[in-house]
Regions:
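Glycine-rich oxoanion-binding loops at beta->alpha junctions
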Residues: 1-8
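Glycine-rich, aromatic-lined ligand/substrate-binding cores of catalytic
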Residues: 108-111, 119-200
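Conserved functional hotspot residues or short segments at active or partner-binding sites
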Residues: 166, 171-276, 296
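Conserved anion/nucleotide-ligand pocket segment
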Residues: 67-148
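Short acidic catalytic loops
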Residues: 11-19, 45-48
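Glycine/threonine-rich flexible loop motifs
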Residues: 18-30
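A short helix->loop->beta-strand "cap" motif at the edges of active sites that frequently abuts
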Residues: 39-43
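Glycine-rich, charge-decorated loop segments at or immediately adjacent to ligand/cofactor-binding or catalytic sites
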Residues: 45-68
């Protein structure tokens, strides 16, 4: 918000449902609102809401020195497991405000922040938002799969935008091993879906989600779908001439840096990167602990 938009206000209320993923831009909007309120000496009240992916923490950290953008403002993992209220207090407490779209936050800037907590929620509880957080996350399954599939947005693969069930299936034209087929079509939720009007072959990810939950491994970010589609694309005739990651800058912004993209393009294993993310995750878990407001149920 601009200074003119805030000029006649006494207080700003922020009440938005997020899904626990760094690149979900409601978080970036919150940071910008905090900075604007700080600049205008306006108090901000965040009406906190549960995180439907509160159990999930992992993935690459954001390198704010190189890829800070509207799909990534804060130096946190791709999936952070926190509520917006907790993250607002963390941004204040860690001096992450004041950078806007630059790569140099100003620790001196503080927002006059009040967080009204939600009640009756524990971090690893199964919880679904009463309304869809956004048009392309229309179901609880789509919300749960979003962290694992969002990086595909910067690739040639479709995540089902332009269909009735986005973020539950993946594919692209010419995926010969794909057991399902779908054709993205412009609709109210996606006016310009990838591969619009072209039949895409691929597979449903719903069964994967059920398997991860049954195995108790759904608390870590999964890159297996990204890997499988990358390998499948490279084995198509189009893959000889066209990169799988067709929007490299956007991919880096989503993933938090260039390391993952470079490893995929070089067809290297991801074990070293995942080990690095594991160490970063441990440090983040310790850092965030002082800002957590909600229990973790046994």
């Amino acid at each position: 918000p601009t200074a003119a938009q805030l000029a006649d206000l006494d207080v700003v209320l922020f009440d938005v449902q997020a899904v626990g993923v760094r690149c979900y831009t409601f978080l970036s909007t919150l940071v910008l609102v905090m900075e604007a309120c700080a600049e205008q000496s306006l108090p901000l009240i965040v009406l906190d809401r549960p995180n439907p992916n509160g159990h999930l923490v992992g993935g690459p950290m954001l390198d704010t020195a190189s890829v800070r953008s509207f799909v990534g403002f804060l130096p946190i993992p791709l999936s952070h497991g926190m509520t917006l209220g907790e993250l607002a207090e963390m941004a204040n407490g860690e001096g992450w405000l004041g950078g806007g779209y630059s790569t140099s936050p100003n620790p001196a800037i503080q927002c006059d922040l009040t967080v009204i907590p939600c009640t009756g929620w524990s971090r690893n509880a199964q919880w679904s938002a009463p309304i869809a957080p956004s048009p392309n996350l229309p179901t609880p399954a789509a919300v749960q799969l979003y962290p694992h599939l969002v990086l595909l947005e910067a690739t040639t693969a479709s995540v089902g935008r332009g269909t009735a069930t986005p973020f539950t299936k993946v594919g692209f034209p010419g995926f010969v091993r794909g057991p399902i087929s779908f054709t993205p079509t412009p609709n109210a939720a996606s006016r310009y879906p990838k591969h619009a009007g072209k039949p895409c072959q691929g597979f449903s990810v719903l069964r994967r989600l059920g398997s991860w939950q049954a195995q108790g491994t759904d608390n870590r970010l999964k890159l297996e779908v990204l890997n499988e589609l990358h390998e499948a694309w490279m084995n198509t005739p189009a893959g000889d001439q066209n990169p799988f990651i067709d929007r490299p800058q956007f991919f880096d912004q989503l993933s938090g840096g260039s390391e993952l993209r470079l490893a995929l393009e070089a067809e290297e294993g991801l074990e070293a990167l995942q080990n690095k993310w594991g160490m970063q995750r441990a440090r983040f878990m310790e850092m965030r602990s002082v800002y957590l407001r909600y229990p973790t149920s046994p």
